């Protein structure tokens, strides 16, 4: 017989049905003998405020926040952790007796991904596609660790704004450009690591890529923050060109482990979470 959970958690986004976060977080709760339940919550942008407000009466203890809400959600929470305030995006919320506090674990998740793959940003030039919530955290990680960054986004103003925020802290280590083929060609010729922080390649956009295959080459490292599918069109094209490819699953699990620790004050069982995430992803792709 199922028992009523002692606390509810979840992930809010749109779309969100692809997420493996419920599988890995519920496995972590079970491993740590916590009677908690983690759910998916699909919320369109126009519903975001009401869903966040419902955390209080429904006593939802915590949420992860994913595309497209990581920046907009800041309007609807009470306080920000200093790191989230600096990044300007939130991917983790804690309900502390009715007070909603926002955190960002994407920064730490990306740093762990770089460390695991032995990438020292100070030695590299990065081309970052997108200027949304994940891009804010990842750009700060790159610049904090000494990397040179070019942000490319379809809305040039957003790319320039994000780059300007980085330049205020890191003295000219970032620039922002409109994402078009001419700027891509010029930027990629001068870069050795590409990071995709857009949703192009997942959900209804699966099978698409922002980068023409002719611009890819063997000496590149291509990182896609997307983890489902585990190999996007961008990663497939890069692999065919002989480039090193990295998907977003490891970053997802690291940031999820950090969220778990914020919510529970317990050490996250990283290996349990990674194994469960891999199994859930395999099941999703059948």
Swiss-Prot record:
The lineage of its organism: Bacteria, Bacillati, Chloroflexota, Dehalococcoidia, Dehalococcoidales. The keyword Oxidoreductase applies. Keywords: Amino-acid biosynthesis, Aromatic amino acid biosynthesis, NADP, Oxidoreductase. It comes from Dehalococcoides mccartyi (strain CBDB1). Shikimate binds at residues 19-21, 66, 91, 106, 227. It is an enzyme of class 1 (oxidoreductase). Its EC number is 1.1.1.25. InterPro entries: Aminoacid_DH-like_N_sf, NAD(P)-bd_dom_sf, SDH_C, Shikimate_DH, Shikimate_DH-bd_N, Shikimate_DH_fam. This is Shikimate dehydrogenase (NADP(+)). Homodimer. Pathway: Metabolic intermediate biosynthesis; chorismate biosynthesis; chorismate from D-erythrose 4-phosphate and phosphoenolpyruvate: step 4/7. NADP(+) binds at residues 130-134, 225, 248. GO terms for biological process: amino acid biosynthetic process; aromatic amino acid family biosynthetic process; chorismate biosynthetic process; shikimate metabolic process. Belongs to the shikimate dehydrogenase family. Involved in the biosynthesis of the chorismate, which leads to the biosynthesis of aromatic amino acids. Catalyzes the reversible NADPH linked reduction of 3-dehydroshikimate (DHSA) to yield shikimate (SA). One of its GO terms (molecular function) is NADP binding. It catalyses: shikimate + NADP(+) = 3-dehydroshikimate + NADPH + H(+). It comes from the Bacteria. The gene is aroE. The keyword Transmembrane does not apply. The active site is at 70 (proton acceptor).
